[in-house]
Amino acid sequence: MTNIRKTHPLMKIVNNAFIDLPTPSNISSWWNFGSLLGICLILQILTGLFLAMHYTSDTMTAFSSVTHICRDVNYGWIIRYMHANGASMFFICLFMHVGRGLYYGSYTFLETWNIGVILLLATMATAFMGYVLPWGQMSFWGATVITNLLSAIPYIGTNLVEWIWGGFSVDKATLTRFFAFHFILPFIIAALAMVHLLFLHETGSNNPTGIPSDTDKIPFHPYYTIKDILGAMLLILVLMLLVLFTPDLLGDPDNYIPANPLNTPPHIKPEWYFLFAYAILRSIPNKLGGVLALVLSILILVLMPFLHTSKQRSMMFRPISQCMFWILVADLLTLTWIGGQPVEHPYIIIGQLASIMYFLIILVMMPAASTIENNLLKW
């Protein structure tokens, strides 16, 4: 008799995706981040659901409703901090996942990669709108500054911003719609993640060598399920260390001050995971130019498959490209640091140089390094 998991219409899908899935035998821990992102998403949806039961999306009561969650709701404080720090863990996993894709040439799976970029953008939009909800100073001014960037779009900009605001400034209408979008987007992300997996399973996983592994596959369960459980345990450990010992480490103290349209904070800055893009935005003295650079800093990922000039897929055997990759990582860390600094000398020039380097490495130096390596190998 055939096993029910292989015949039942619903269980068959789960079986083919997580149990009997043929997987390369040599994928490293860098391949753990997909499952970790799934865990992060489930965790965010669950904690978010419980927060939404007590939150009110009204400018008069939003801030006090968050205070009420932390003080009066049973275990409300832990749910709130798990949600806030869960977002940080989500982005750490996202950046690692994208970095893995760049290093090992996973972007040659075009559909999977492009849906991944859409997922990244959707997650960034969700996180931005979530940051507005507590209605602290940084929530209000962050929303004002970032939505105002759209006014740089010629002709329709101002009308577009007022349409998004639902008025002439960030107010009750803005907060209510941001809450609505923040609630619905994670479910759209979950659906997109399924499509992401669907396209991945059409081709099968890449592996560290970048060489087709059809001759050497092993079942996903038990080998990679146990490996994913280890990764999940480490993720939960780091998250709970953050939540229980330093819950405000990655937050901004200004967000404990209720939103006040008459008082601007000394340094308006987004959450740490947006700082690299914020630094690129600030490094260009022109508004429209800055907005374009900001958008391109993420959308440049779409170009990665077309910038791949190497005859090899992975960087595993390409030392010059490896150097370029790690210089890019260092550059992104520099941009993240600069994004959190005030706009003054020497931070301005460092930010401008790091921004130029970012685009230069991706658009010029990495393809050039690949071409040099091809010539060295006489390919």
UniProtKB/Swiss-Prot annotation:
The protein's name in its UniProt record: Cytochrome b
Q: How does it sit in the membrane?
A: Multi-pass membrane protein
Identify the coding gene: MT-CYB
Q: Kindly list the biological process annotations in GO that this record carries.
A: mitochondrial electron transport, ubiquinol to cytochrome c
The cross-references to SUPFAM superfamilies, in alphabetical order and at most eight, read: a domain/subunit of cytochrome bc1 complex (Ubiquinol-cytochrome c reductase) (SSF81648), Transmembrane di-heme cytochromes (SSF81342)
Which residues bind heme b b562 per the record?
83, 182
Species whose genome carries this gene: Capra falconeri (Markhor)
**Quick one: where is this thing mainly located?**
mitochondrion
Q: Which family does it belong to?
A: Belongs to the cytochrome b family.
Q: Where along the chain is heme b b566 bound?
A: 97, 196
Free-text remark on how the cofactor is bound: Binds 2 heme b groups non-covalently.
